[in-house]
Amino acid sequence: MALNGCQSLIEQSYQPSISPSSNPQIVDEVQKNDPRAAMGAREHPRIVASYGGEYKDAKTERLVARIAGALTAVSENPRQSYRITILNSPAINAFALPGGYLYVTRGLLALANDASEVAAVLSHEMGHVTANHGIERQKREEAEVIASRVVAEVLSSDIAGKQALARGKLRLAAFSRQQELQADVIGVRMLGEAGYDPYAAARFLDSMAAYSRFMSVDPEADQSLDFLSSHPNSAQRIDLARTHARAFGQEGSVGDKGRDYYLDGIDGLLYGDSPEEGYVRGQTFLHGGLGIRFDVPPDFHIDNKVEAVMATGPNDIAVRFDGVADNQNQSLTNYISSGWVTGLDPSTIQQITVNGMEAATARASADRWDFDVTVIRNNAQIFRFLTAVPKGSDALEPTADVLRASFRRMTPAEAASLKPLRIRVVTVRPGENISTLAARMMGTDRKLDLFKLINALPMGAAVSPGDRVKIIAE
């Protein structure tokens, strides 16, 4: 959660004044007088702002530019230039805008284990650019919107319009999945022709699928239920990527992984949350700038987003935490009833104290959900917890109690001691094994699982003296 967001009224969109880097890593100058480049240029500041700004580290920028440069040399459109931006986000994501704007998050760089895996991601995004997928999708979206409006107007039926819109979304989803598969084909070809391991695409798709399972509160949940997703399911993409890679030779016998220079380039990379947005440490959220901290119950997962801190737990329990400026200095009981809570039960509003701070609570309900609303005043700000459980669940009060009981001010010494986590590349010494190395991991209660994940170590794998591995530490 951004400090800026809590010092003024929290909004659903985050638009800080962040300008493009004065010295970005550019493979080539963005082509002038290109309408596609103009479209990308318009969207670039918004993309950068929504992902926490640019990640500025000369060593890592040079690494990414080196990989992109090798791919550009074998591009289907050698006249196409690219601008590569590393986004300051722990999310694992990469995407492209028309005109050659490519984006990769530092979270993705932290998960990758060699240059060929990042090359697989970038070549896929370059495939979108060279195939003009962004322009094609925009045209298709405009056509589907027009078509659904025509159906609604001709038939004079809201139901018909909604049905037409739903069919349009399905057609767009299929179109997007087709684009993704086409970009995969282009990407694997570029990988092999650039001299990288062509099997890196399948390998990194495996890693991303494993990360998705790791982050899920329910690891057994079906990851393929979202049939409107713009990406085909991972199993399908992995199989197809391996099939296309075989054109270059057998797995393990072709291409360069670029592991050593890649690990050199990400050693010291910021991992997880940035200082401006606070830190997640296991079941605890801490924000030195705001001077506050709180815990979530066991088995909950915290997701620190720009606009708010979200937490999810078993049995569909969800928590949202954010803050607003205390501009009117009204009583907190009046604040709760001022209209921002839907389905509020006024009879449940009561004033309380939370670790010496003025606070108030209330209950609300809407559709299939019951809510606890807790607001706490501290230093001219109002912090807000919204806890949601399925209607009738007995977990509402225990969950809200944990949040309230643990919310407190940090001491100046506590705030000053907070440090960001980083990727640290270490060499395995004699006598060390996966368990001893995982014990050095910080910021997680699942040390062994996360160590295996970020190093792409399969079940039963071992390490040997001299191997280089990643750990997460301050």
Regions found by a protein language model. Give the residues of each.
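Extracellular LysM carbohydrate-binding repeats and other cell-envelope/extracellular binding modules
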Residues: 446-474
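Residue-level marker of beta-strand positions
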Residues: 293, 299-301, 433, 462, ...
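Signature of long, low-cysteine stretches enriched in small and polar/charged residues
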Residues: 320, 337-387
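A Zn2+-metalloprotease active-site environment signal
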Residues: 4-290, 294-296, 301, 306-308, ...
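Extended non-catalytic domains of envelope/secretory-pathway proteins
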Residues: 299-301, 309-310, 317, 322, ...
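Short, surface-exposed polybasic-and-hydrophobic patches located at secondary-structure transitions
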Residues: 312-323, 424-426, 471-474
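Primarily a LysM-type cell-wall glycan-binding module
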Residues: 413-445, 467
